[in-house]
Amino acid sequence: MERVPILKIGDILLVSIQVDMSDQTAVQLQEDLAERIVATGCHGVIIDITALDIVDSFVGRMLSTIASISKVLDAETVVVGMRPAVAITLVELGLSLNGIRTALNVERGMELIAASRADEWDAAADDEDTETTATA
């Protein structure tokens, strides 16, 4: 069975899918990724599907499942490298990638995750300011 490599870049895990996704490979990827998120404390997951010529309903569901698992573990998922034909196929199949943000490439995906984390920090700082003002 082939394994999909998971690379750590800063606070982000990069998954580059370069193999055909069998059921077994998908389940293994889900388990490996969940373990890596917990082990590293990363808050972002980028899934690069540039090498995939076809994304069928199985791969679409797998991406949604990975995003859900990542979200439960406090990591945001961004899918990058989607080709126009793949996007068209997903729409034609009626698949919505709930909970998954998309970006054109890895760099843009990293920017999305960084911006999202910055927004969370700003919101947390605002909450602290409100609590401090209320108790003063």
Residue ranges and their predicted role:
Residues 40-43, 47-96:
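Amphipathic alpha-helical interaction surfaces in cytosolic regulatory modules
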Residues 5-8, 35-39:
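Short, conserved, surface-exposed binding loops centered on an aromatic residue
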Residues 99-109:
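Short acidic-hydrophobic, aromatic-tinged amphipathic segments that line or gate anion-handling sites
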Residues 27-31, 61, 111:
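Short, contiguous clusters of charged residues that form electrostatic/catalytic patches at enzyme active sites
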Residues 30-37, 44-46, 64, 131-133:
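Extended, hydrophobic alpha-helical segments
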Residues 115-136:
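Intrinsically disordered or compositionally simple regulatory linkers and C-terminal tails
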Residues 37, 66, 111-116:
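Catalytic cores of nucleotide-enabled group-transfer and carboxylate-activating enzymes in metabolic
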Residues 2-30:
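STAS-typified acidic loop motif
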